[in-house]
Every structure is written in C-alpha cells, then in structure tokens.
Amino acid sequence: MKLTLNRILFSGLALSILFTLTGCVGRDAHGNPKGMIWEFLGKPMSYFIDYFANNAGLGYGLAIIIVTIIVRTLILPLGLYQSWKASYQSEKMAFLKPVFEPINKRIKQANSQEEKMAAQTELMAAQRAHGINPLGGIGCLPLLIQMPFFSAMYFAAQYTKGVSTSTFMGIDLGSRSLVLTAIIAALYFFQSWLSMMAVSEEQREQMKTMMYTMPIMMIFMSFSLPAGVGLYWLVGGFFSIIQQLITTYLLKPRLHKQIKEEYAKNPPKAYQSTSSRKDVTPSQNMEQANLPKKIKSNRNAGKQRKR
C-alpha cells in the first residue's frame, strides 16, 4: 500500500511540474506570455538573454545557459534548505525506527479496519511526541518560492525573440533535439541515482519508481519543446546534481552526527499510549442475553388447573 502510494505521488508530481511551470505565467490572445510573474521575472530574464546574445556577442544558446546559471545560483539556497529539512526528518525517522516498529507491526497484523485505524492513530501520536512530521520534510514554502523563477526562465528561454532562429553547437534552438534530450535524461537519471545512494536499503526499494520517473518525465518535456528550453533543463540538471552531492556528502553526514549525539544524551523511549485499549471481551450479562431462552413446557398448565 505504501509503495503504491509513493508511485501515485511521484507520478502525479511528474505530471504536475509541467502544468505548474506553464500555469505561473498566463498568455494573451496571441499566445504571448503575460501576467505579474512574466512582467517582474520573465521580462528581465528575457532582456538579459538578449543582452548576452547581441550586446556581448555570445549567441542565444550561451546566453540562455548564462542566465539560467545566474537564476539557479540565486535560488540554490532555497533548494538546499528544502533538502536539509527532508534529510533531517529522514535521519530522525531512522533513529526512531525501533520506537515505531511495534506500532507498524500492529498495523500490518491488524485483523479489522478498526484495529488498523487505531494503530495508525497511535503511530501519528507517537511521531508527534518525538517531533516527527511526515509532511515536514516536503518544504512547501521553499518550493513555492522557487516555482515562479522556474516558470519565468522557462518562458524566457522559449519566447525571447531570436532564440527560435538561432543555433548552438549545431543544434537548432527552435526545433526539438534528440541529442539534447538524451543528455538531459542521463543527467537526471544520475541525479536520481545519487539520491538513492543517500538512503537505506529499505527506503531504496520504495524509491525505485522515482529513479525512473524523473528521467522519463524530462525526456517527455525536453522532446516536446524547442531545444532552447532544453538548454534550460540541461543547466537545471547540472544544478540538481550539485544540490544532491551537497545533500548526500555534506548535509546528511552532519545531520546524522548531530542527531546521533542528541539521542545519545537523551535516548528515545518507547511510546506509551495515553488511551487504554477498548475491552472487547463480552461481559457475563451480554453472554446471558445472547443465550436462547428456554421454552416453557408447562405454559398451559394454569389453564388446565382452572378447568
């Protein structure tokens, strides 16, 4: 059940990213971008792409790469903060596994839906008692802050005048590129593989779907859009790898050491449920009520005496 839920979540995420990118910026009747995100973020990015391409004489391909590097560098701290929150929750869950294991076992061995729900409620209470928030590692606010930048850069790479008629290293930026799509898929597959190396074997089994979902999603989006947008995804893939390397080899080891020291001073204790379990043993009165009543054999005896 948990694995199926993960597959649904990651598949939904893969499909929603493209819709989110296109949804942050509106379009007018002629299909041109419009709206606040475009005016305050997209237009300046488009201006700098045009500046590096024409005024600096670098060409539109290199201009897209430079502007994407600048934008991704600015929002990298938000991505790292999001990774830090997720890693912190993950490390705490790993240390508290012996505490939650008996409750998880009861969930699996539940004989009825009521027993399962009661155990799940107890698990959530135990997680709260130990400072665990299952959704706390998602970090919605940093992601929401990043999405307008992603969306603005996406449209700037697609709609800046001159991009569609330019080439970069023999690649037509106005057309789809199979070579660029293959490179992008390889980058995001490597990033997914790195993320798998940072988790336990049990979590790795549950995350297998994600390892293939992201590259497949990037293949779909990159090959469906002009190569100019593909350059944006290409640079984004390198930054995703950089962020994952920092998370795997810097953040997680430090968090592991920190949490280990915390629990060495204050070892986690088994969770004691405050609510007593409901006694489902039938009482003596209930047993007697459920017994079949004896048929009175002398029910007509009184009538016969009166005769």
Curated annotation (Swiss-Prot):
GO annotation, cellular component aspect: plasma membrane
Concerning PANTHER family, the annotation shows:
CYTOCHROME C OXIDASE ASSEMBLY PROTEIN COX18, MITOCHONDRIAL, OXA1
* Identification of the protein by name: Membrane protein insertase YidC 2
From start to end residue, where is composition biased (Polar residues)? 271-288
InterPro entries associated with the record: YidC/ALB3/OXA1/COX18, YidC/Oxa/ALB_C, YidC/YidC1/YidC2_Firmicutes, YidC_ALB_C
Q: Which CDD domains match?
A: 5TM_YidC_Alb3
Function summary: Required for the insertion and/or proper folding and/or complex formation of integral membrane proteins into the membrane. Involved in integration of membrane proteins that insert both dependently and independently of the Sec translocase complex, as well as at least some lipoproteins.
Q: How does it sit in the membrane?
A: Multi-pass membrane protein
- Please provide the record's keywords in A-Z order: Cell membrane, Chaperone, Lipoprotein, Membrane, Palmitate, Protein transport, Signal, Transmembrane, Transmembrane helix, Transport
**Which chain positions have N-palmitoyl cysteine-type lipid attachment?**
24
Stretches for region Disordered: 263-307
Residue runs in coiled coils: none
